[in-house]
Structure formats: C-alpha cells, structure tokens
C-alpha cells in the first residue's frame, strides 16, 4: 500500500535507540500508535542531550578521580534535591515496569535525565566545578557521576546502545551495564524538606527568568530584589542560586512588602512574591517600541491562521494533520499576543 515504515531506514537516519524510545514514550498497552518523524527526531535529540551531558561530566573529571557517594555533611541543597528526585524516579519507574506500563516508565526516565539532571543540576554544578572550593568541586563531581550511573541503568532497557557506550566510559564501570544491579529506591536516601525548599526556589527562579526574558533584559544586568514569603528558609538557604540564576545582587526577605511599586515588577509564585526594580535595567521607550512591533507581527500571524480555519474549504479538504497544525499555530500565536500584552502593561 506504500504506507508502511521501513525500520531499517529509520535506524540508519535516527539510530536504533531513538526508534526504540519513540515506540515506548507515550505508548499504552492495547492501543495502536501513530509513527511520526517528529517523535523520532525528539528521541534522537534526547540521545544527543544525554551524550553531551555525559561528555561534560567526563571532561570535568581529573585523572585521579575516585567515584563514590560523598558524606552527607558535604552535600549541598541541590545535591540532596537531585538525589531525592533520583530515588523518586527509580521507585516510580520500577512500579511502572512491574505493571508493564512501559510508556510511563520510559517517559519518567527521560524527564528526569532531561529536565532535572541536564537542564538544572548540571547547570548548577558548573559554578561549583569552576569555583575555588576544591571540596565542593569534588562533591559535585561525585554526585554527577553517581546520578548519571543510576540514570543510565534506568534508561538501559529502552536505549541499550547509548547507555552501554556511556557507561563503559565512566570511572569504575564494570564489564557491561547489562549485568549491573537495578537501581533500588529503597537503598537511596531522600531529603523531603530539602527537596521541597529547592522546588520553591526553582519556581521563583523560573518566574524571574521568564519575566526578564519577556522584558528583553540581558543576563549581564543584575539587580536587587525583595521577596515576600511565609517560607524564608528556602530563600535563606538558596542565596547562591538566586545570585547565579535569578541575577540578584542582594536579596531582602520579608513577611509583608511595604516598599514602593513605582518602576517595580512583581513576580508571583505559589510560595512567594518578588518585587524587582526592573525598570532600571531597560530603556522603557525602546522596549515598548520593540514590543508593539512584535505584537503587530503576532496579530498578523494569528489573523492568517484564523482566516484559514474560518474557510470551510480548507477545513474540509486539507489533510487533517495540516488542519491540526494550523490550530496549534493559532493557539501559540494567541498565547504570544497575550504574553506581549502583559509585558506592555508591566511597562505601563
């Protein structure tokens, strides 16, 4: 019929691991799944992400590096967070596999590696690895390797080739990953309070970075901030993270903010409100001009997609995939318009 997929051609283009992972993620027992190049590309991108992360870790290991878990008193907030998340992921993935929920298990391993290990923990470790505290640098290296080792074992059933290749390159690795003990969450330590505090910090940092991006503030420009919160402990412990990732020069904590709101942008999360004098970092008139130009462009795009979808001939005759893509693009354009309008309102 000409509508089949030759798996060997897919493997040649994307790799066997990418195809295997695509077939697992999002699949449920008893249901058919639709093949798409986009999904295989996403799985290949994940493999590339993992490979690059492992290369970064290996490049930062000295020749005399000895793997192992550091003593608890040497672990900082981010170490305890990533180790707690690893324990949670191992427990959930094991439970999913016991119930033959392969799609859920694969998705959870991918989310842990991509979002938690690569996007957050590795980024956090960069300043520690390059810092003057040799003990902290060694602790970061040990946790990076220990977590990577366990994550590779969790991922191995789904992506056996890349996990074996990376595992073999790790210090202290055995002959093959296939014969290694499965990560047992019951043998891992978790720190619920440290983990919860770090999640509070992450929510706040994400919100600050989002609004800085929306207002086109360069990362080199830093400012003070006042944080109104009923949970000051998380922010007290996380001062270094606020300086590094929220671009704070200094942080004041308060139960109730009573300062001025003129030229101040408010950042709201479930656990805190941040008050940041953002206007001192930007050229207000120049930024408003840029935003209005972006708004005009986004409105033109939205109108184009809207006109297509309002045309009965397009909806009836165009391929279903194209119609759905147009709906998705319209929704994205409308979200963009809303975000731009919020930024314009914030600038007054």
Residue ranges and their predicted role:
Residues 1-31:
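Alpha-helical recognition segments enriched in aromatics with Gly/Pro capping
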Residues 31-39:
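Short, solvent-exposed helix-loop connector elements
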């Amino acid at each position: 019929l000409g509508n089949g997929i030759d798996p060997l051609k897919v493997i040649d283009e994307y790799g066997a691991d990418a195809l295997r992972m695509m077939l697992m993620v999002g699949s449920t027992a008893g249901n058919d799944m639709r093949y798409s190049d986009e999904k295989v590309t996403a799985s290949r991108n994940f493999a590339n992400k993992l490979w690059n992360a492992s290369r970064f870790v290996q490049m930062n290991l000295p020749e005399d590096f000895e793997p192992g878990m550091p003593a608890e008193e040497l672990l900082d907030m981010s170490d305890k967070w990533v180790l707690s998340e690893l324990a949670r992921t191992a427990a959930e993935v094991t439970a999913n596999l016991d119930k033959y929920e392969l799609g859920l298990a694969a998705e959870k391993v991918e989310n842990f590696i991509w979002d938690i290990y690569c996007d957050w923990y590795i980024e956090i470790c960069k300043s520690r690895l390059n810092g003057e505290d040799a003990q902290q640098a060694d602790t970061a290296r040990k946790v990076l390797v220990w977590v990577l080792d366990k994550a590779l074992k969790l991922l191995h059933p789904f992506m056996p080739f890349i996990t074996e290749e990376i595992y073999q390159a790790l210090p202290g690795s055995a002959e093959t990953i296939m014969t290694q003990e499965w990560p047992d969450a019951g043998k891992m330590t978790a720190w619920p309070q440290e983990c919860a505090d770090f999640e509070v910090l992450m929510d706040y940092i994400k919100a600050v970075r989002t609004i800085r991006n929306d207002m086109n503030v360069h990362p080199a420009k830093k400012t003070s901030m006042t944080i109104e919160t009923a949970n000051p402990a998380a922010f007290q412990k996380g001062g270094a993270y606020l300086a590094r990732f929220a671009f704070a020069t200094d942080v004041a904590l308060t139960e109730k903010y009573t300062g001025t709101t003129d030229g101040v942008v408010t950042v709201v999360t479930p656990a805190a409100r941040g008050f940041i004098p953002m206007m001192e970092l930007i050229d207000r008139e120049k930024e408003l001009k840029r935003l209005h130009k972006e708004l005009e462009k986004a409105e033109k795009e939205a109108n184009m997609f809207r006109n297509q979808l309002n045309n009965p001939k397009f909806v009836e005759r165009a391929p279903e995939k194209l119609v759905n893509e147009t709906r998705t693009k319209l929704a994205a354009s409308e979200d963009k318009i809303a975000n731009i309008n919020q930024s314009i309102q914030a600038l007054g």
